[in-house]
Amino acid sequence: VDRRQRQMCIRDSCDFKDKSLKRLAKQMAHVMYKNAGCGLAAPQVGVLKRMVVIDCDQEDGQRNPIVMLNPVIVAREGDPVEEEEGCLSIPGISVPIARPPFARCRYYDLDGQLWEIEGDGLLGRCLQHETDHLDGVTMFERCEPTARLKALQEYEVALAAGARPGETSVEG
């Protein structure tokens, strides 16, 4: 895993006056959709900013990305449920991770307006997974030690078979 992904982003690292954030959001959404993802955090593309793009409702073919600046999980509810998770930065594998099924997240949009989003199932899991990236936590740190060892071995096999983690970078 790229060492940049294990770095924590500063809590309020996105300045709403920064015009480059709109361009970055568009690039991140492009990378996410190109790689069939439902979420992408800025550290995954080499940018240490607290910024996430998610779209967990693509079944109807419509793209409705939500750009989240300085997101913070403000609530997690329910007994942890173990489900397989994948990650665009660690292609070719999935890992069983136990998370509470419900999450509520507070964030700002690109115009600096404060929002809250909440969800369970895929959305709740995605909110938690992507904000983990902002805190320097990958799915390897979230899984049980035996699952971690198995996942690392599978990742080596995936890399040997052609999986390329660097394909999530955005062009400057």
Over which residues does each language-model region extend?
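Active-site His/Glu-centered metal-binding helix of metallohydrolases
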Residues: 126-135
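Divalent metal-coordination and catalytic microenvironments
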Residues: 32, 73, 129
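Short pre-active-site segment immediately N-terminal to the catalytic Zn-binding motif
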Residues: 109-125
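Helix-adjacent hinge/juxtasegments
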Residues: 50-91
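Single conserved hydrophobic/aromatic residue that forms the stacking wall/gate
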Residues: 1-10
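Charged, well-structured alpha/beta interaction segments
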Residues: 27-48, 53-57
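Acyl-group handling in specialized metabolite and lipid biosynthesis
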Residues: 11-19
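Post-HEXXH active-site segment of zinc metalloproteases
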Residues: 91, 124, 137-172
